[in-house]
Amino acid sequence: MAKIRVYELAKELNISSKELITLLEEEFSVEVKNHMSAIEDEDANLIKELLSGKEKSEKTKEEDDEIETTAKNPIKESMNNKKSNKRDDKNEKVNTENAEDMGIITMTSDTITVKEISDKLEKSYAEVIKELMLMGVMASVNQEINFEMAEKLAAKFDMEILKEDEDEKEDLEDILKDNEEEEYLQKRSPIITVMGHVDHGKTSLLDAIRKSKVTSTEAGGITQHIGAYTVELNGEAITFLDTPGHAAFTAMRARGAQVTDIVILVVAADDGIMPQTQEAISHCKAANVPLIVAINKIDRPGANIDKVKQELTEYGLVAEDWGGDTICVPVSAHTKEGIDDLLEMILLSSEILELKANPNRKAKGTVVEAKLDKGRGPVATLLIQNGTLRVGDSIVVGSTYGRIRAMFNDKGRNIESAGPSTPVEILGLSEVPEAGDKFYQTKEEKTARGIADKRKEKIRDEYLQSTHKVSLEDLYNQIQEGTVKELGLIVKADVQGSVEALKQSLEKLSTEEVKVRVIHGGVGAINETDVTLATASNGIILGFNVRPDNNAIIASERDGVDIKTYRIIYDAIEDIKSAMVGMLEPEFKEVVIGTAEVRQVYKISSVGTIAGAYIQTGKLARNAGARVIRDGIVIFESELASLKRFKDDAKEVAQGYECGLSIEKFNDIKEGDIIECFIMEEIKKKTL
């Protein structure tokens, strides 16, 4: 049901928002928080009827009152006369005037720049900066101030600033929340990503599966644009993504998009595990996605399946026929041998995963890839993960939006609708989205546009606040906040021996409290792929006798990834040790710093009980812990609320002196009580 904001209805009825809010609460028992709150159209119509009835009775009562009212409300007449094609611009102007009359402005985020608040207050930058200076805040035009400061500043200009209520914001997940009970769910097709080393036959394998020749049309044998395909086996569909390879797979995961159900790792039988194969394994483990190994090129003379299985064990992947749980399927893209076995294994794995979705709800999913086409405008390949998408539907995609003008399947045919696990290419977006952006279907385009605008504003705010990834220097703080549970590392070195040495040494540092996990180890310079993996896994990159290339440096600065390089292995290990020592939970010990005997008690009505005490041992310190001991039994434990020497506040009072004190939240002090003062000292851990 459509809604209307309070200030808009007030303007339409020619009454103040305050009057309308009172009317809503008293006449209709509708609670609204402020003029930005939204109410149902049904309630709005009832109010209009009520007020129109009142107006008629007032007209019959006294015509002079009506003339006087009209004189007092010239806006109503001007509004009625000016309803025309220029309505949008004038509404905007009247809305602003309405807000000004009430002296209320709003802000949607936690902070606002001096420039923005000056514009909202309609004051010069100099005036606002001057007021801030008088409040003890030195700020430039582009500097941000928090809500509390903005509130005080607005009050100086006789204005009120309100933070837009979170309940009023259109939360997309709530808008699109559908019933996902078991009865609504239906089985869906598995979504497969193909990964592996270059030239190991990923595209040829996809080609063999689709039973069509596409490899020959590609430049240099490298995948240019395959996108996503759906194939069928025994009446069951399987969706394949080639995005291409693990770079885009991780880029999407870094943006929070987990689209893949199963990964097919292609390994050449005559080549074995190669650097990109290692990277692919690391990515799968980091994403916690099931993996099926397709041992390709078994028709080659030098093929050695057992050697590949042996090499896989070094990365924790033990084949099923070797007693492990990794499915390994020997295949040949050239002779089509083993293709059906591979597809059967995919379907078997998907059955175990119990993949389900609700096709009878609003669609949602992920952008696989997107581009700007000269003739067609923004084009996006979407993977529908839930619901059904139709031509004409309005969607919000990341920080862009649109209405679907046309939709094509993986074979390039024009289609009207698509269900879960279906890849489609769509036209009609306002801008080009990014791979990994999530899309949601909305009721109307206006809603989608509103959400997209809010997201753009949020992205801008996040950029200004410059949030950073994990670094060795701030690991302790992040552990304390509970944002980091383990230390993830990516190790690169000049030779494989150094990689293994570092991995073993670093993983041995793991304790019950702090876990060190080497996400990926490889030989060669630190590249952009390493930075992407670190971004997705919130990890740190360690380089031994290697340096990051230019692209990696740019990416690390952009994404806030910490890169550390060393020439001595010992230095790397010591740095990690130091970071982990900081990460360990601190231990504390109690240190009694003094005792005092209560000699006299004073009861003051406005303050409570004050004890006059004599320091027997050590000293008493303000804000230190305090125990009240009576006849050798601890009867209360808190802290010293106040400590005085004569009439003056004292930070501490030493042995042999008298003092006045009070205990936080305790008034039952009696003469003869012993006050034991203590502090908690941290015991710093020096070793793991």
Swiss-Prot record:
Subcellular location: Cytoplasm
Stretch list, region G1: 196-203
Gene Ontology CC entries for this record: cytosol
Region G2, residue ranges: 221-225
Residue segments, region G5: 332-334
Region (G4) location: 296-299
Residue ranges of the region described as Disordered: 53-100
Keywords assigned: Cytoplasm, GTP-binding, Initiation factor, Nucleotide-binding, Protein biosynthesis
InterPro entries on file: EF-G-like_DII, IF2_II, IF2_N, P-loop_NTPase, Small_GTP-bd, T_Tr_GTP-bd_dom, TF_IF2_bacterial-like, TIF_IF2
Binding positions (GTP): 196-203, 242-246, 296-299
SUPFAM superfamilies linked to this entry: Initiation factor IF2/eIF5b, domain 3, P-loop containing nucleoside triphosphate hydrolases, Translation proteins
Protein family (similarity comment): Belongs to the TRAFAC class translation factor GTPase superfamily. Classic translation factor GTPase family. IF-2 subfamily.
Entry protein name: Translation initiation factor IF-2
Name of the gene encoding the protein in the UniProt record: infB
